[in-house]
């Protein structure tokens, strides 16, 4: 199980937040500071696509959207195929990138397409907006 977090409004953001949830993901940890008071962090437990290209936080191709994700999208291969037919290009083989592309394609309506257990946060740098969602049953 991975660990994700988002911090806003605190001027003292440090790697301490990553350390607190390090037991949730021993394979990789990273924090992205957007400003002195906004940060996104992720502790990874590698399950799908063990390659470092799937480390998080993960950026969209244009670097405007950043995602942190915990869980599993069971139908991600079907969604990936649908998105590729719509012109999306993927650089990893995991479900995190599929989730991000789904949001970029369908916005909040992407939630109706996911079959799985998940919690994720997407930060849009150009607007400083966040989108946070979890699975229907609150497993994650």
Where are these regions (language model features)?
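N-terminus-centric sequence/structural signature that marks the extreme N-terminus
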Residues: 1-140
């Amino acid at each position: 199980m991975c660990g994700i977090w988002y911090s806003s409004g605190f001027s003292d953001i440090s790697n301490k937040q990553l350390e607190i949830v390090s037991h949730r993901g021993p394979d990789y940890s990273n924090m992205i500071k957007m400003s002195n008071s906004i940060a996104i962090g992720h502790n990874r437990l590698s399950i799908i696509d063990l390659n470092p290209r799937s480390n998080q936080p993960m950026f969209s191709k244009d670097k405007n959207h950043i995602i942190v994700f915990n869980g599993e999208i069971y139908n991600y291969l079907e969604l990936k195929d649908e998105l590729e037919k719509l012109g999306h290009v993927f650089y990893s083989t995991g479900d995190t990138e599929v989730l991000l592309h789904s949001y970029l394609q369908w916005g909040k309506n992407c939630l109706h397409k996911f079959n799985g257990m998940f919690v994720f946060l997407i930060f849009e740098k150009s607007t400083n907006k966040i989108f946070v969602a979890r699975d229907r049953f609150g497993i994650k």
